[in-house]
Amino acid sequence: MSRKTIPRETEKPKKLTRAQKKEIDAVIRKYKGDGKPRTAQATIPYEAIYPDGVCRIDRRTFSKCIAFEDISYQLAQPETRTAIFEHLCDLYNYVDASIHVQLSFLNRKVDPVQYAKSFEIAPQGDDFDDIRAEYTAILQKQLASGNNGIVKTKYLTFTIEADSPKTARARLTRIGLDLLGYFKTMGCVAHVMDGQARLEVLHGIFHPDGEPFRFDWDWLAPSGLSTKDFVAPSSLCFGTAKTFGLGGKYGAVSFLQILAPELSDEMLADFLKTESGILVNLHVQAIDQTEAIKTIKRKITDLDAMKIQEQKKAVRSGYDMDILPSDLATYGEDAKKLLNKLQTRNERLFMLTFLVLNVADTKQKLGNDVFQAAGVAQKYNCSLVRLDYQQEQGLVSSLPLGINQIKIQRSLTTSNVAVFVPFVTQELFQSGAAMYYGINAKSHNMIMLDRKQARCPNGLKLGTPGSGKSMSCKSEIVSVFLTTADDIFISDPEAEYYPLVKRLHGQVIKLSPTSKDYVNPLDINLNYSEDDSPLALKSDFVLSFCELVMGGKTGLEAIERTVIDRAVKAIYRPYLANPCPENMPILSDLHQALLDQHLPEADRVAQALDLYVSGSLNVFNHKTNVDIHNRLVAFDIKELGKQLKKLGMLIIQDQIWGRVTQNRSQGRATWYFADEFHLLLKEEQTAAYSAEIWKRFRKWGGVPTGATQNVKDLLSSPEIENILENSDFITLLNQASGDRKILSERLNLSADQQKYIDNSEPGEGLLIFENVVLPFSNPIPKNTQLYKIMTTRLSEVVEL
């Protein structure tokens, strides 16, 4: 076997022939490539995304991302809109030249079939499955007519350069906290995203059909895959000048040419109103203030030099030297104004790139979507232009990674950038046990709420006759009945709820002077109060009851209160010693306990009670003989008459409070709907007790709702402040002009918001939940069984 001699390093290598050189160059080119990515993963321009949300774009560039929610802007008070705009300006001014900011607004379609299934109410094999099916159909119809097939999300990505990941993390964390502070001042909910959330967003962009994202950090090491493999599309094709292929879909990236002399704060919102899949990105790069001022001064110097040349030319030609080309004069004035803004006002200079990414199933649909977006730009005197041979760079720049490879930029000041307000209207779309409350009239999205999760779930429904107030209550009752196991009680002064309660197999308790249904106002249970003794709160109720019975503007005197309290303690002593139904006192026991004190004040109270104990209005002087353990109970008090109606409402409220205290120990909520609620607050004697109960309901798992058409009476109550402060849910339907003015002042409604309660159709108005005010519409189709059992129109009421 012959040996090959290995040449020493000092030996001169053999000279290559021309053919050998060409062969080697070909091999190098083959393996080195032309710099173009050959895989979908290679197009995604980052090196790594870490679990804490830091993205390493290259060796020295790092980014983090904040997800933020919408807030009510377009319908807000003018001063609120101004404040939001100023806070946006502050946010942009915070960003210096070392921080690149990217705002991303993603409208992504979800699987409509899976999305619709999430609104299905499962059948339970009882008599209400047909109603469940009909109610589900109503929800799914509203879903189809609205925009809820599109999930709208908003992101702010900030990018910096650093020498190491450790240094980058420290600075990114600090910047993130500062930016969250700015969002908080705007009343906007925001949070810094972790790595998995950022990957899920990328996956959603690359998989527009809503394919579920499956990923776990523990999968990376065993599989040998990178995070890109979990988010990349099946294919990317950039073979044409103005479109690209994304899996089985087509996409196009366009840039916005800002030609308008003035910009509108509604332009960005109009881009996002489209019902197609769209991704809008704003890349904002601050320019160092000193450098910006120097640049503008140089421009002014150049313009002045051109002006001098034009003046010399004018002198040589023999015409007036003050006559200059109009463009030159305009540019000179604009440059000086810009310099003045930077030097004397809180303005900075930014370079803005505005990109719009459309994705569709077909080229024709893509063309239509791009045309629609271009129409929005045209509306504001701007132009949307497709990128030529830069679609790949456009796609990369549309990913919320903080990278901008499109160098088509427009210089704008702080206020010009902030005019692209990223807010429209706040959505109310809670998950979990949320119930349907209508359609957001501004965004056409469904309103899904869980009142029990609110700080104070108590609510009010206010509207003129015929505005849909009763329908609103009944719609909520149906939702509670079908989707929860909660108890529901109704105080029904007009006997309007009977058809609904009967169809849902509920119980109607008819209270009247001639009825045989009796409810004892002195009923009590051992859980009646938080205190060791339940008598303290019950004594308050009896005092309110007696005040209402005795009438008068001054209420009970101090001695009268004392004798009543003494009598209350006496009549409950046997029951507290042995809590059985036989020992439960009734009004005649209270009457006798007052007489037994042999005091003039006690006798005076006893005489006032005579009418309700042994007189013609003794309907409440009986032990309770109705079973109120049905989960749906309506108290029909229509025939109580004017004299007894207020007493009846007070007694019903107390009965429901007793049920609330029982249900709390079982972990069950209790809903209470009080129609003509103003009657309880109109009289000072009952207002204080009602306000106290209103406050206590929240702690004990109660969800009360007061409904009335007499807004003036309601708002004139001395206790209305307590009621409003403890009510985080208010439905405003059509209002009379006087009531609308009062409500607008009380609830701080803007002029635009007031339009939704002025001559509005039945079932339309404003919904206030915590600090959110939304215009809504909640129509119930007339051809449904639900409508027939809920309507109160005489021509539509049917016998069941």
Per-region residue spans from a language model:
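Hydrophobic anchor at the beta1->P-loop junction of P-loop NTPases
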Residues: K461
